């Protein structure tokens, strides 16, 4: 893959290496949103079928990205909404604890903590190893060591949101299946930019906000719920998710049944005429790019930066345990953090500080000068 910067509207003097914060919209996604506004401006253009047809197409496209059937996909407004549906349907009559990671994204932690509090369960927080060598492998081992027949659920992200650490999701998923625990995963920081197969990993629920690596707008997202959830209780009772919703002439013939699969977990008003076309266009482009090609592009792009970091005593996770589109590095004592952040800002190099980690998150809109600008700024801050 070559640079796709021409599909975006980023100025040349902006070095935006911060897709994990929020992705820029492609021009085509902007256009879809503008067309959606025009459609909403003239509702006579909307038929009853329009409330459902594009939503089904979006589910189909997302299902292909994560290797899941479309009828097990739901449209959600946020990752926290999708997580709540997943966590609230964990069977509460077995087990005595749930597991999360230390320094996990707040919504993931809060959702798990609230469920544990409500159901009188312990929340086990798995800390990272204190040593940096072999850290990712040892962290996965710590998770596995805490899992047993009394584990209700393991709730974690596909990669750690602060530094891109990869966990062995396959081993964790297999052990969850073995001990009959739910495996609930937040894919917001990797799905769309890194390949994933929910069946192979034995994931029970996967939630993704769209505004990061799915390249979509804010306030919409997608979730996968396995068949274990098909009789669960949704966050809300939207008429659009009921079995007779497509026939507008019969809506007051109230029914108990939902549409099949995971449809009950759709947010109300999921057929947003502005956001949904934008997300549809973004998913189409991701499918054309392919997540594995995005990883390869980012891996080649960041190689000069990784070489510089390695040569100058910066710590970062070793290649096979770290994502290429999102990774973090620790500063050596020779670098003044506050001075560095100030110079990054003045040079229009956009990265994030998460804890003690400088997080770099490139994508296909980035080019070599973006990486070079970061390297030059780091060089200028060595004492």
Task: Give the location of each predicted region.
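Pyridoxal 5′-phosphate
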Residues: 1-383
